[in-house]
């Protein structure tokens, strides 16, 4: 039996549930799938109960780190969603920092019985650092709170916390409901789940497609073809490339070099254009073999710049994950692996942080010995003698 064809007619959006342990993230995920299956039956909308989401996380490898996540899919009248729910707090942290699950937006689940808790704060901070710009709040377990004023207080507290981390705390949507009651079939609470999904549909913008973004192609290999010029090969990260396009070669060297594309090839065949995801060879006019190397990127002119200093949000592998056995201190100098190459850099720890233990996550300042094409949201690994000891994401460019 052939698998059903993936329907591209609806825009696809990636979302997830975030929030403190036991506030109801997985129950809400189950409630969304179940209520949508009841209200908008389709081959995509299949009810998933708590146990099936909780018990069957997939182990994903990303940058040498194992991450457990549960994925469900569902659709509303206007969109198709992939929804990610990570079982443990450490899985969330790793997931967000490694970019394993890129979320276009997220539902922050807060139990009305507790209000914001330490991991609520941490997940909001992580969302800010890794560039999840759109959060919707679901105040869960409202059926267990009799006092209307208490609910108002909790909502105010959540909004203040979001504003503290530069989210539009006063304006973003807050939905009050009960995931468990909705799962049990209480129509009042089912209606609230539908209201939540309408809000997700309207509040989280449709993501820009990778092909619409400016060209970025990390160079993996370089060779010269006698009489034709220099070819750089790699997988197009985003954007498109066509013959006669003007491009820039960015990173590692002090000077950014401009060139013109004279040919695009894939599997030895000429292409009119290469698209995001394609493995291509790009023939470049006016570029000598020694003027381009692995670790640089080919990019749309002006779209990305080389930098040596940035702030990063990093997760340091624990000993059990194959990481370091000992902490590191200020001015630790590992290699930073960006896309296709290692560059040595030094780490400055935040004021008041004396050392970083294996298994910690921390904000660091990095200074690289060579400039690399980076921007907010670029992910990297931290390596020591070829093995991964950490993973991170650029949260702010400094110089």
Swiss-Prot record:
GO terms for molecular function: GTP binding; GTPase activity; translation elongation factor activity. Residues 64-68 are annotated as: G2. CDD domains: EF_Tu, EFTU_II, EFTU_III. Residues 85-88 are annotated as: G3. It is found in: Cytoplasm. Its EC number is 3.6.5.3. It is an enzyme of class 3 (hydrolase). Residues 140-143 are annotated as: G4. GO terms for cellular component: cytosol. Keywords: Cytoplasm, Elongation factor, GTP-binding, Hydrolase, Magnesium, Metal-binding, Nucleotide-binding, Protein biosynthesis. It catalyses: GTP + H2O = GDP + phosphate + H(+). Coiled coil: none annotated. Residues 10-208 form the tr-type G domain. Residues 19-26 are annotated as: G1. Residues 178-180 are annotated as: G5. GTP hydrolase that promotes the GTP-dependent binding of aminoacyl-tRNA to the A-site of ribosomes during protein biosynthesis. HAMAP family: EF_Tu_B (MF_00118_B). This is Elongation factor Tu.
